[in-house]
């Protein structure tokens, strides 16, 4: 068993209302003639505002992938360090306590990876184990928590951390007037989050408040590579998003959740807290419909989408933090649930302390 000891979310300082972002986008080169559909998609996203890593007026001139990626590396390390220090403080631990660091991102390329750069900035021990996760996209927050558990099962005295940083706005140089690209401009924001987890023996020493990470399950769906991902070129990273995404959720998700819970002699009625990635309005509705959830079950998911947009892998960790702050009843079960490129689902079973 592993225990979550701290969670912290970090957001860049530049915050704009959805209407401000929309007004800026319609002035991007080549997008003015698509103003009607841009405004319609942005209005339908149910996003009230987003944080961006750059001032809004700088984006129209950011046309080179290399320039955008240099900004990504600098700002991602800054935000990642902020998130990790916050989570360590929440756990009453220090950077020198970290035995393993995992990082998750899909919105920029860094070699050496973000974990090496964050380790250098914070002075992590030279024997720290590193696990960079790239390409998982929106599922990486839940999958990263699952991988912390996998590691700590064999290292019950250790401290393992996950740092997720997504600067989705830096993919704007690749935006073209396709439905996928324009949906992305309506939903995605910038942000980071970190989780500190400890093995069961270390949990007793630091009096970790939980929740416990009990189990996880991954599901990779057949013939679904086309559903979501990046089209990568000299333009940078351009979003690929199939309208079949919600159909795939409705086809597979209920059975995935039911069989996973069955293995623990649980049902959906036993889940007191649903920690679900926000995706977008259609994704949230598909999850709720597939699992026959009452409206209040995904209230924190809807709230996160409205307040900060979709932060890709970092979103579910912000929602995890918000859920912990609500203090679910001791002994009750929680379920983390996210989906991403592959196409795939990651489920993580929690138990509140």
Curated annotation (Swiss-Prot):
Pfam families: Chal_sti_synt_C, Chal_sti_synt_N
Entry EC number(s): 2.3.1.-
Catalytic activity: methylmalonyl-CoA + hexadecanoyl-CoA + malonyl-CoA + 2 H(+) = 4-hydroxy-5-methyl-6-pentadecylpyran-2-one + 2 CO2 + 3 CoA; methylmalonyl-CoA + octadecanoyl-CoA + malonyl-CoA + 2 H(+) = 4-hydroxy-5-methyl-6-heptadecylpyran-2-one + 2 CO2 + 3 CoA; hexanoyl-CoA + 2 malonyl-CoA + 2 H(+) = 4-hydroxy-6-pentylpyran-2-one + 2 CO2 + 3 CoA; dodecanoyl-CoA + 2 malonyl-CoA + 2 H(+) = 4-hydroxy-6-undecylpyran-2-one + 2 CO2 + 3 CoA
Active site: 138
Transferase found in the keyword field: yes
InterPro entries for this protein: Chalcone/stilbene_synt_C, Chalcone/stilbene_synt_N, Polyketide_synthase_type-III, Thiolase-like
GO biological process, any: lipid biosynthetic process
GO cellular component term, pick one: polyketide synthase complex
Keyword Phosphoprotein: no
GO molecular function, one term: acyltransferase activity, transferring groups other than amino-acyl groups
Taxonomy, superkingdom: Bacteria
Keyword annotations from UniProtKB, A to Z: Acyltransferase, Fatty acid metabolism, Lipid metabolism, Transferase
Residues that hold substrate according to the record: 180, 241, 277-282, 312
Subunit comment: Homodimer.
Similarity comment: family membership: Belongs to the thiolase-like superfamily. Chalcone/stilbene synthases family.
Protein name: Methyl-branched alkylpyrone synthesis polyketide synthase-like Pks11
Organism: Mycobacterium tuberculosis (strain ATCC 25618 / H37Rv)
Gene: pks11
